[in-house]
Each structure stands twice: as structure tokens, then as C-alpha cells.
């Protein structure tokens, strides 16, 4: 479906994902689960846009819908064995996005930043700029694009924004750390922490 694809991503070329039986379509957008935990959980307290088998109401966005990311841009996998962008899969980066530890700022080039199943088979193990770590869980993924210098995303109020790779990120804070120690990147990915974001 064209609306789910970014024309700037050279990997969004119609090649289907071969993971878990194959023939899965790819996309370039994923729901913001939370920047505060590893993997997909049904715990809504970490403040993303959604979680497994859960629903969120507008009143739950204490930080404001204009200050909370709903959808992050993702890059499709680099080959048919790379599950990133494969939206039917439950793993982060295939229909959702979470930023945690070394899966940090947009377009992170850390060699093991994306934790995902099938990483070694995909050929991206420890290989920047889309390096990954072979994880037996749903892992972690960061926002990615082929736009120069940053990524696009959709806020909870339906506005779109562009954020640069240099956005403030406190990568050392597991589980986001105390509110006062969070970077802007974490703040805009939580909805109910009472954070003041300011301009970004």
C-alpha cells in the first residue's frame, strides 16, 4: 500500500519479507510503544502511544497530543531476511518502534543498536549504519530514514514533524531514568510524565 511506504527508502521496493513463512509486505512507519523498556509489553505505564492488547484515550496524554509521538518513520529491511519494516510481525521495528540504550537517536549508527530476532541471518549483525544484535526477544529499534540528517514522524494530534539526528538524547538512562534526566527524544515519546518539552 503506497501510503505505508516512504519513496525515499530504497529498500521499499516491493520485496517481501521472508521471515516466519515469508510473503509479508513491508512499510516505513511504526507505532511508538515507549522509549523506556526493552521489547513489546502490555504495560501502558511507560507512556508510549500504545501497547499490546491495550487502548489509550486522548485524556491519557497528560503531556499533550502535540508533544507526544504516535508514529515513527522506519527503514525497511536491507534484504528479504531482515524483518525490519515487515508490519505483520510483532517485533519492534516491524510495526512499532522503541528507543532504549544503544537504539538511541534517529538513524543511530551504533553497530548493535537494533535488537531483533533473525539478525544474524539478515547479514546486518554489528554492521552500521543499520547494525543489529541477534535477540531472542522482540528487542528494540530506533527511528530510521534515508532522509538527510533526520526522520519524519507523526504526533498524536495528527501533525507531522521532522527531527534531526542531533536531537538531545540521554542514552545511558535505562528505563528512561528520572524525568529530569531525560533528553528531548525520550520526552516526546512518553505521553504522561508531566514533562516540559519546549521547542525541538
Task: Enumerate the language-model features and the residues they cover.
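Extended catalytic-interface subdomain
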Residues: 1-11, 16
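Short cysteine/histidine-rich zinc-coordinating motifs and their immediately flanking basic loops
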Residues: 16-24
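Hydrophobic alpha-helical interface faces used for helix-helix packing
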Residues: 23, 27-200
Amino acid at each position: 500500500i503506497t501510503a505505508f511506504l516512504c519513496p525515499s527508502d530504497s529498500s521499499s521496493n516491493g520485496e517481501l519479507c521472508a521471515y516466519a513463512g515469508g510473503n509479508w509486505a513491508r512499510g516505513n512507519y511504526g507505532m511508538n510503544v515507549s522509549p523506556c523498556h526493552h521489547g513489546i509489553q502490555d504495560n501502558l505505564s511507560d507512556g508510549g502511544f500504545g501497547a499490546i492488547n491495550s487502548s489509550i484515550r486522548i485524556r491519557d496524554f497528560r503531556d499533550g497530543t502535540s508533544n507526544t509521538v504516535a508514529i515513527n518513520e522506519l527503514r525497511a529491511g536491507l534484504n528479504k531476511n531482515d524483518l525490519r519494516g515487515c508490519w505483520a510481525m510483532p517485533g519492534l521495528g516491524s510495526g512499532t518502534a522503541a528507543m532504549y540504550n544503544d537504539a538511541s537517536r534517529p538513524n543511530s549508527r551504533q553497530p548493535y543498536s537494533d535488537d531483533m530476532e533473525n539478525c544474524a541471518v539478515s547479514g546486518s549483525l554489528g554492521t552500521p549504519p543499520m547494525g543489529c544484535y541477534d535477540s531472542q526477544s522482540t528487542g528494540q529499534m530506533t527511528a530510521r530514514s534515508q532522509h538527510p540528517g533526520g526522520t519524519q514522524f507523526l504526533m498524536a494530534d495528527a501533525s507531522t514533524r521532522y527531527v534531526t539526528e542531533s536531537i538531545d538524547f540521554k542514552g545511558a538512562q535505562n528505563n528512561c531514568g528520572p524525568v529530569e534526566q531525560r533528553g528531548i527524544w525520550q520526552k516526546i515519546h512518553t505521553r504522561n510524565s508531566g514533562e516540559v518539552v519546549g521547542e525541538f
